[in-house]
Amino acid sequence: SNKKVWDFVNSIVEFNRYTNCPVANYKGKLYNLPFNMNTFYQMWGVLTPEEAKAKIEEQKKEALAALNGREPQNLEEQALCLVGKDIFEKLIKEYTEKQWGRKCTELPAFIIKRLPVRWVFDNNYFNDKYQGIPIGGYNQLIDGLLEGIECKTGVDFFHSEYKDWKKYADKLVYTGAIDEYFGYSLGKLDWRTVSFKTRIENTPNYQGNAVVNYTSHEVPYTRVIEHKHFEMFGQDVYNCTKTVVSEEYSTEYKEGMEPYYPVNDERNNLLAEQYRQLAEKESDVIFGGRLAQYKYYDMAPVIEQVLSLFV
């Protein structure tokens, strides 16, 4: 955790105490995430770290033996070598295939360099010292960042007067898709996107958690979000008699959709690097964020990067 980042965002809006502790639902059975002693107890009934380690090591050996001395060639082989068959098949395989729209045997091994495993009973998804969500939601943070700054929405940068931006500024901060900036001159990058189906449930507490991942193909969506758990805790959950839930669906990006995630396969990584080389020649343009750098970023590292550039 970066205290400078935490202090900066809290200077704009106060953050609450939310910590992400997702639950996985595999065919009606629940497992805590990330992989920790609670998960291993739910999976095998083991009570001690040594029992859990023995179970995973046994399954890892089977996976390594199947490779017969060669390196893992795809995500499935890599994951099996890291956590074994049970965790892979119930919590990784089908969820990953829904996320990426590809079989695990078709995804490159390097997507999963490592899978964090905790030998303690700890469901806190992140290890960061500072965690939370802006009180009132992220709109409060964005409004605070833009305070006193002229902001125009609904403007297509590439089909407006601002395309000739040097009339207005010495430098441009560009956060759109890097391939679009260069007119797709080297080809189009692939993206994944998500869509949501949101509804109101006539119950104060629908699933008891902010995030529940659905890790089997039997359910078409990847997860269900119950929004009130981001901001309401304890008895406050029941003070509001209804709740808003969203089903999240992962799909292939098509023109007109909003791109969310870069596709980290060999073709796209090579193409993205070629675009980054073009970007380096644009001395008056700062390419920042997921779309402009074609990299998956969490929020804190992006803010840290911005502070290093401008503060």
Protein language model features and the residues they cover:
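N-terminal FAD cofactor-binding segment of flavoenzymes
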Residues: 1-31
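Short, glycine/charged-enriched secondary-structure capping and boundary segments
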Residues: 12, 186-189, 301-303
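Conserved beta-strand segments of alpha/beta enzyme cores
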Residues: 14, 150-152, 284
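Active-site/ligand-binding neighborhood in enzyme catalytic cores
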Residues: 20, 24-34, 38-171, 182
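Mid-domain catalytic core of redox enzymes
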Residues: 158-278
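C-terminal catalytic lobe of FAD-dependent flavoproteins
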Residues: 258-311
